A protein has these predicted regions:
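Catalytic cores and adjacent binding grooves of peptidoglycan-active enzymes
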Residues: 26-43, 164-305
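Active-site acidic/histidine clusters and adjacent loop/turn architecture
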Residues: 53-125, 187-194, 201-204
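Bacterial N-terminal signal peptides
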Residues: 10-20
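Bacterial N-terminal signal peptides that target proteins for export
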Residues: 2-11
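Extracytoplasmic
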Residues: 117-119, 143-147, 238-240
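Sec/Tat signal peptide C-region and signal peptidase I cleavage site
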Residues: 21-25
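Acidic/His-rich structured neighborhood in mature extracellular/periplasmic domains
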Residues: 129-184, 243
Length: 305
């Protein structure tokens, strides 16, 4: 990267770090513990979310992704170290820094490439539990060990966060309250480069961001636009982007294929309708899955040493 590009990155990141907000992007350790306790009190004993929250180590089985992204489990997952060259794991008390070996390798590759682009370091959010499966809090997917949330906040340059900071600090919200656009001073060329690099990784199936962030990427990209196809609008995702890898395990099912094109036209515009941004009415609570709702092999994953 040339001097002028690096200078632009540095300026953008310096501005971004001035806008850290007090509102938490994710629950801190105490809030998470309280939420988990409340969920556990309400769940039946056979709820899959309860069962998969117990194991503290991965299943000693060959690595595999079993089932669907929102109804499955992970065999032979490995742990992403809390610290590495170019990344730091956030909210480590959750023990959600596990994934398929392909996911761990992809995170490390993204961290290395992003540093070359001038991003100081990745702050890695939730991956999967040691054996995947449904989680007590926070996610409908993240069950196969093939997904990771990457904060849209860069790591501080030149230092490691303390354990307290990792448990307590907030990510930075890039999207304005009306959900119609990003804050122009917060979405920087560095963010565009990070999303581009992630989308161009061959194992990545798709990336979820808020529609306002997708829109900002669409209008900011002046070069080759094919990578934008993988960047998909979704509700929330104003503080982080969600990376999902392709599943090559015959025991799992991939999502539907992504439509052709860069996704910057009519299919994006619908996300800015008021009824989509702020839906009215109560949502039906999701079905409480039991182990019987998951693939049979997930029982073997739970029972494995």
């Amino acid at each position: 990267m040339g001097f002028m590009k690096r200078a632009t990155f540095a300026l953008g990141l310096s501005i971004l770090l001035l806008f850290a907000l007090p509102a938490l992007a994710q629950s801190n350790a105490a809030e998470e513990a309280q939420h988990r306790a409340e969920v556990l009190r309400s769940l039946p004993q056979n709820a899959a979310r309860r069962l998969f929250a117990v194991p503290a180590s991965p299943a000693q089985l060959p690595a595999g992704a079993i089932g669907a992204y929102g109804k499955g489990c992970a065999a032979g997952a490995i742990r992403l170290e809390p610290d590495g060259p170019g990344w730091q794991v956030m909210r480590p008390s959750r023990a959600r820094n596990f994934g398929h070996p392909k996911l761990v390798a992809s995170i490390k590759a993204l961290a290395a490439g992003a540093q070359q682009d001038g991003w100081p370091g990745l702050l890695v959010g939730d991956m999967a539990q040691p054996r995947g499966g449904p989680m007590l809090t926070g996610h409908a997917s993240h069950q196969l060990g093939l997904e990771v949330d990457i904060w849209l906040t860069p790591a501080p340059a030149g230092r490691r966060l303390t354990l307290e900071e990792r448990e307590e600090m907030s990510a930075i919200d890039l999207v304005q309250p009306d959900l119609l656009d990003v804050y122009p001073e917060r979405f920087t060329p560095a963010h565009l480069a990070l999303l581009r690099r992630a989308a161009l990784m061959p194992d990545v199936d798709r990336i979820f961001v808020n529609a306002a962030i997708k829109q900002a990427a669409c209008r900011s990209e002046t070069g080759e636009r094919g990578w934008l196809r993988k960047v998909r609008p979704w509700e929330g995702h104003t503080y982080h982007f969600h990376v999902a890898l392709k599943c090559t395990d015959p025991r799992c099912g991939n999502r539907n294929s992504i439509p052709a094109g860069d996704g910057c036209g009519k299919e994006l515009a619908r996300w800015f309708r008021e009824e989509v941004r702020f839906p009215k009415g109560k949502r039906q609570p999701p079905k409480i899955l039991t182990l019987a709702d998951l693939p049979k092999a997930c029982g073997q994953v739970l029972a494995a040493p």
